[in-house]
Structure formats: C-alpha cells, structure tokens
Design a protein with these regions (language model features):
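Phosphopantetheine-dependent thiolation modules in NRPS/PKS and related acyl-activating systems
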Residues: 2-36, 40, 44, 50-80
Length: 80
C-alpha cells in the first residue's frame, strides 16, 4: 500500500465514521474544522485502528491537529 493509498483510506474511514459532508483534505483540522467532540474523535480513532490493524497510542495523538498530521502518524506506525 502506497502512502497515497493510506491517505485516501484514512479520509474514507473518517468520512464514513463521522458522516461528515465536508470535503476533507490534509489541512482539515479535526476539532476546529470538523467540529468533532472528544467522543466522536475516540470513535473515529477506533475505526482507523480497526481499518489498519494498528494501535494509536494516546500520547501520540495528543499533538495531532490535522488530517495530514494524523496520516503521518498512521504511516509512521505502519512502518513500525
């Protein structure tokens, strides 16, 4: 799976998980632009963990603001 494939899958999972109608880009801010509550973010992260078969450490997610930063984190975790 290429980096571009991973990024597309992340956006697909987020769109499905949050049922957002926004056009998501790497610059979309998860809280500010999408208006997600902390509970919605937890559900979204669970869906991403399931989709990629990974665990996203809470300590790592604290500094993530945008979908692009989330993509970078997931790609980093996938590379091990």
């Amino acid at each position: 799976m290429t980096t571009q494939d991973v990024k597309k899958k992340i956006i697909d999972v987020i769109e499905e998980s949050t049922e957002t109608e926004l056009e998501l880009t790497p610059d979309t801010e998860i809280f500010a632009d999408m208006g997600l509550s902390s509970v919605e973010v937890v559900v979204m992260l669970g869906d991403l963990e399931d989709a990629f078969g990974i665990d996203i450490p809470a300590a790592d997610i604290r500094n993530v603001r945008t979908i692009g930063e989330l993509s970078d984190l997931i790609i980093f975790i996938l590379k091990g």
